[in-house]
């Protein structure tokens, strides 16, 4: 039995994109949860989570978001949030982390309930500025520019290209 399908949205060795719009509905039709890893595609390949409706999404700000290491994230589809329960308790997983009442612990009602103890703030500060910068440009603009550069490379070195030739697959 399969309970969870983990899919890398983009593969680092080839740039190949996984067909999420095919995989996610197929998994859902069989009652299988989906976890999408967007570490290689965040910031360069636009995703519409309202259309795709994955159950979970993970990523980092290292690659195209240029945010540096240490700022990873977990997104949980609101439909799945109640099903998921943390295995550990952390300061920031509390509904009110500044209450300091160990006899009245309530998990936060969002994905924050999975956050552990005191986080290192530096990676998140760097990531915030980087994400804000690229958000002003727009992921579609960045994607189009990247595709133009890939087309130039594909035209000059067609025999050397490892990535798919078709732009919608890379």
Labelled PLM ranges:
Residues 1-170:
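Pyridoxal 5′-phosphate
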């Amino acid at each position: 039995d399969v309970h969870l399908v983990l899919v890398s949205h983009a593969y680092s060795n080839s740039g190949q994109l996984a067909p999420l719009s095919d995989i996610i509905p197929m998994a859902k039709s069989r009652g299988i949860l989906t976890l999408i890893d967007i570490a290689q595609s965040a910031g360069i390949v636009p995703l519409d989570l309202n259309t795709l409706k994955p159950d979970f999404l993970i990523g980092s700000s290292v690659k195209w978001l240029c945010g540096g290491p240490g700022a990873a994230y977990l997104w949980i589809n609101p439909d799945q949030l109640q099903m998921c329960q943390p295995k550990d308790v952390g300061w920031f997983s509390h509904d009110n982390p500044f209450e300091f009442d160990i006899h009245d612990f309530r998990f936060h009602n969002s994905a924050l309930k999975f956050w552990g103890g005191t986080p290192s703030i530096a990676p998140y500060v760097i990531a915030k500025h980087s994400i804000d910068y690229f958000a002003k440009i727009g992921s579609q603009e960045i994607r189009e520019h990247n595709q133009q550069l890939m087309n130039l490379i594909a035209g000059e070195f067609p025999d050397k290209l490892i990535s798919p030739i078709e732009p919608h697959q890379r």
